[in-house]
Amino acid sequence: SFTSMMLTALLVFDPTEFAVKSERFEVVSSLARKVLDKAEDVKELVDLDFNRVIYLGAGPFFGLAHEAQLKILELTAGQVATMYESPVGFRHGPKSLINDNTVVLVFGTTTDYTRKYDLDLV
């Protein structure tokens, strides 16, 4: 549902010409296909024994981390504790929440400077 809402918002509210929006749509579709190609990797995560999930993201990925956190909380009816934070903010206290039953997922950026923080944390 998040992807559909995001694509709809981009198509409706972005004043860019339709041809440019169409190209962007193709890029997003291609990225979505790559995610689906990783289904086996995702299944490995689901099979882990966890009761906490922490999503980390910076810049535009901060909102994505928040949305992902809400989805897990909603889909598990609160049975899985969730949190979201930026990678830099996570270092200052929240990382103490990690235990053996915690999965931490980082939405890494491609910005060289910020990516250093993402990789260092991982």
Residue ranges of model-derived segments:
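A SIS-like phosphosugar-recognition module
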Residues: 1-122
